[in-house]
UniProtKB/Swiss-Prot annotation:
Name this protein carries in UniProt: C-X-C motif chemokine 9
Glycan attachment positions: 58
Gene label: Cxcl9
Record's keyword terms, sorted: Cytokine, Disulfide bond, Glycoprotein, Inflammatory response, Secreted, Signal
Organism encoding this protein: Mus musculus (Mouse)
GO terms of biological process kind: adenylate cyclase-activating G protein-coupled receptor signaling pathway; chemotaxis; defense response to virus; immune response; inflammatory response; positive regulation of myoblast differentiation; positive regulation of myoblast fusion; positive regulation of release of sequestered calcium ion into cytosol
Amino acid sequence: MKSAVLFLLGIIFLEQCGVRGTLVIRNARCSCISTSRGTIHYKSLKDLKQFAPSPNCNKTEIIATLKNGDQTCLDPDSANVKKLMKEWEKKISQKKKQKRGKKHQKNMKNRKPKTPQSRRRSRKTT
């Protein structure tokens, strides 16, 4: 009985607070109307995002954001774009490795040096 009352009070409380579940959708339609087959060097990229097909858009979309802020839709079937995606993924994985390496170096600096067992033991003087 107590658990049912507490459950109902919890539901009423959440309702009063305005907690609602909402569906988050990227867009109600495809973001890319047309695509570019032109070549973009991966060093000029700021970001590269790939969106899988969804109920609202039945095609794979790749959106490149350049360092100057321009956004371009790329053709996912193009050989140049596939190569660009591989280079971008390689660049991102290298950045993650560097970040992990810096974190490891920082942890190593914060550690106290270990002393040998012989130094820890108290020596008897005779």
